[in-house]
Regions:
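Left-handed beta-helix
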Residues: 1-10, 199, 209-371
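Unchanged
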Residues: 1-254, 365
C-alpha cells in the first residue's frame, strides 16, 4: 500500500434522513441488524492496509463515539495505526456553514500533521465494498491529480436525488460535478469518494474557504475540472447511498436478496463491527420466519417475513412483521401486525394492532415510542 491515510467524511446540510437522524448521524445508523453504516468505509480502509484514519463528525457525536471508540475492533495495527474522531464547530444540521470544508478547516492542525503523501476520502453515509489499495494504484498509474469514484445507475430520475453526478468525457475525464436534478435516468453517481495528494487536498480546502464559506469539496473540485486532471473510476458491485429515509429502507431491503448480499460481502473482505455478547436467538414453536435477517438475542414467537430484525427484539405470539426494518430492543406485542415500517430502538408496539404503511412510502416509528 502506498503511504496514504484515510478520511471518513460526514454528511452535509443537503442530506437528511427524516426521523432517524434526529437521534444520531447517518454513520451511526443500524444496518442489517448487526452493523452500523460507518463500519463499511472504515473496514474498506483497514482491509486495504490504511491504518491511519480520521473520522469527521459534525453533529450528535455520542452514538458514533460509543460505536467506533478507539477503533480496535476494526483490526487497526495497534502500534503504527490510529483512528481519530474529529469534530466540527458547526453542529446545526441545516446550518449553511455546515460543510465538509468547514469541518476540515476546524481540524486543519490534525490534517497538517499527517505525513502521508496521499489521502483517501470516503463518506460515512454510503455502503459499498472497494479495495482502496487498487484504487490508489490506479490513481498513481494514471498520473491524474484527483481520481473520483462513481457508480453508473439507470434510475437517477427517482433515486439519488441528493447526490452529485459526474459529467465524463470518453476518456473518463471528469468535466463537471453537479447535483442530480432527476432529469435523466442514466447517470454517473459520484460516490463522494476520491484520492489525491495530501498537499493538493490541503490547498483545495484553503482555496475553497477563500471562495465561499458555503463551498464543499465537490464544489471546489467542480471549479477545478478545467485546470486539474480529474478522472473517474467506475465502481462495480452493490452500492447504496443513504441520503434520505426511502434510501435507508431500500438499502436494507435490497440486501435480503442473496445475490445482492454476495456483491457486498466477500469471504476475504470482512466488515468489522463492535461485537456484543448475547445469547442466540430463540425460535419458539409458533415462530415462522422467511427471507429475513435476525440478529442475536431475540425471542421470536410470531411471523417474520422479508424483514431485518435488530438485536434483542421480542416478537410475540400471533405478531406479524413483514417488509420492515426493526432496530434493537423493540417489542412487537401479541397479534400486532406491522408492514412496510422502520421501527426505531426501544419502541413498544402493543396496543395498536395494525400498523401498515404503503409499500412505496414506508413509515417510521420513533425511538422509545409506545403504540
Amino acid at each position: 500500500m502506498y503511504k496514504a491515510f484515510g478520511i471518513v467524511s460526514s454528511s452535509g446540510r443537503n442530506i437528511y434522513v427524516d426521523g432517524m437522524q434526529d437521534y444520531r448521524p447517518i454513520g451511526a445508523f443500524s444496518f442489517l441488524g448487526r452493523y452500523r453504516v460507518i463500519d463499511f468505509p472504515i473496514s474498506n480502509m483497514t482491509n486495504s492496509d490504511i491504518d491511519r484514519i480520521q473520522v469527521y463528525i459534525n453533529n450528535k457525536p455520542r452514538s458514533v463515539v460509543e460505536h467506533v471508540g478507539t477503533g480496535r475492533h476494526y483490526n487497526i495495527n495497534s502500534k503504527s495505526g490510529k483512528l481519530q474522531l474529529l469534530f466540527s464547530e458547526h453542529n446545526n444540521d441545516n446550518d449553511i456553514y455546515n460543510t465538509d470544508i468547514s469541518c476540515y478547516l476546524d481540524n486543519m492542525e490534525s490534517l497538517s500533521r499527517m505525513n502521508h503523501p496521499y489521502v483517501v476520502i470516503a463518506p460515512s453515509y454510503m455502503v459499498y465494498s472497494i479495495d482502496f489499495d487498487q484504487f490508489l494504484h490506479t490513481h498513481i498509474e494514471s498520473g491524474a491529480d484527483v481520481t473520483l469514484l462513481y457508480h453508473a445507475v439507470d434510475n437517477a430520475k427517482e433515486a439519488y436525488l441528493t447526490c452529485n453526478v459526474l459529467g465524463l468525457n470518453r476518456q473518463k475525464g471528469v468535466e463537471s460535478i453537479e447535483p442530480n436534478h432527476g432529469n435523466k435516468k442514466n447517470q454517473y453517481v459520484y460516490m463522494d469518494t476520491c484520492v489525491m495528494k495530501t498537499e493538493l487536498f490541503i490547498s483545495l480546502i484553503k482555496e475553497a474557504k477563500n471562495l465561499s464559506s458555503m463551498y464543499t469539496l465537490a464544489d471546489i473540485l467542480n471549479d477545478k475540472c478545467e485546470t486539474l486532471d480529474i478522472r473517474g473510476v467506475a465502481h462495480k458491485g452493490f452500492f447504496a447511498s443513504i441520503t434520505d429515509f426511502p434510501s435507508y429502507y431500500a438499502a436494507n431491503m435490497a440486501l435480503l436478496n442473496y445475490k445482492s448480499a454476495q456483491e457486498l460481502f466477500h469471504e476475504n473482505w470482512p466488515i468489522y463491527t463492535r461485537t456484543n455478547d448475547s445469547c442466540p436467538t430463540q425460535y419458539f414453536n409458533t415462530a415462522d420466519v422467511k427471507n429475513s435477517v435476525i440478529s442475536n438475542g431475540c425471542q421470536i414467537e410470531g411471523t417474520v417475513e422479508n424483514s431485518v430484525i435488530g438485536r434483542g427484539c421480542v416478537i410475540k405470539k400471533g405478531a406479524v412483521v413483514r417488509n420492515s426494518v426493526v432496530l434493537a430492543e423493540v417489542t412487537v406485542g401479541e397479534d400486532v401486525h406491522i408492514e412496510n415500517e422502520v421501527v426505531d430502538k426501544w419502541a413498544k408496539l402493543v396496543h395498536k394492532k395494525e400498523i401498515v404503511s404503503p409499500a412505496e412510502q414506508p413509515g417510521y416509528i420513533r425511538r422509545n415510542d409506545t403504540l
